[in-house]
Design a protein with these regions (language model features):
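Conserved glycine-rich cofactor-binding loop
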Residues: 10, 17-18
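Conserved glycine-rich Rossmann-like NAD(P)H-binding loop of the short-chain dehydrogenase/reductase
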Residues: 33-47
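The beta1-alpha1 cofactor-binding region of Rossmann-like NAD(H)/NADP(H)-dependent oxidoreductases
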Residues: 61-71, 103
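Substrate-binding pocket helix/loop in short-chain dehydrogenase/reductase
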Residues: 97-98, 102-110
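Active-site helix of classical SDR
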Residues: 121, 157
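Residue(s) in the substrate-gating loop at a strand-loop-helix junction
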Residues: 141
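C-terminal helical subdomain
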Residues: 177, 181-182, 201-256
Length: 256
């Protein structure tokens, strides 16, 4: 779509059909990137392709399934032979008391929030290397800083993601592969993740009441109730277009 800050770049965005992921994908295309959209829903991917044109390619992908991730990155490799930017945005969460967590509720969050980035980073690094270096932006959460009642598994998975970022940063910095942890606060338009995982109304009401009582909502949402997804997208462009040789290990983004 013409010249831009990301002209000639190839990007992969997970969770690309809703919330911040959708905004990031759209902004990357506006800046001239060829963007591969990874998400589970075929219809929403097709809608994004129609909206963004030939600069966007949707690949139905379950990031928690290693075979699905391999297949997605094989498409990128076959068509582009390189990758410049990986954005791990896909995530899922819902409020549940810790002692009420089912095995499935635990594993669904681990597969999407932690195993997903592990699988995508593993698949992306050879393609980033082929490009002569690039950027991985992994979206973490203020749940690793603030203690949110009833979001224990979400916090655990995001803390694990931050440890992954640290490890990859050390291992691949000599290859000019930069790994940025984006500790993202509340974004307007975000939900409980892009997988359509329904929230229990009773648990949700209890959780929001606790968060209000604990003062967490006021601290993380600020005066405006959260940051816009467009501002989150703008931040992603900044992170991956800053001068080579400049590292941003951890970025904390929130409303005020």
């Amino acid at each position: 779509m013409g010249e831009g800050l990301l002209s000639g770049k190839v990007a992969v965005v997970t969770g690309a059909t809703s919330g911040s992921g959708r905004a990031i994908a759209k902004r990357f295309v506006q800046e001239g990137a060829q963007v591969y959209l990874l998400a589970r829903g075929k219809e929403r991917l097709q809608e994004m392709e129609e909206q963004l044109g030939s600069s966007a390619v949707g690949i139905p992908t379950d990031v928690g399934d290693p075979d699905s991730v391999r297949a997605a990155f094989e498409v990128v490799d076959q068509q582009q032979h390189k990758l410049d930017v990986l954005v791990n945005n896909a995530a899922i969460y819902r409020p549940v008391p810790f002692d009420g967590l089912s095995d499935d509720e635990i594993m669904v969050q681990f597969r999407c929030n932690l195993l997903g980035p592990i699988y995508t980073c593993r698949a992306a690094i050879p393609l980033l290397r082929a490009a002569g270096g690039g950027d991985i932006i992994n979206t973490s959460s203020e749940a690793t800083i603030e203690s949110f009642a009833m979001l224990s598994m979400y916090a655990v998975t995001k803390a694990g993601l931050e440890a992954l970022c640290q490890a990859l940063r050390t291992e691949y910095e000599q290859e000019d592969i930069r790994v940025t942890t984006l500790v993202q606060g509340v974004a307007l338009g975000e939900g409980g993740g892009s997988t359509g995982w329904a929230w229990d109304p009773e648990h949700s009401a209890t959780a929001f009441q606790r968060w209000e009582q604990d003062g967490i909502m006021r601290r993380i949402a600020g005066r405006y109730g959260g940051q816009s997804v467009d501002s989150v997208a703008e931040l992603h462009v900044f992170i991956c277009t800053r001068p080579r040789g400049q590292k941003l290990d951890v970025v904390r983004s929130r409303s005020y």
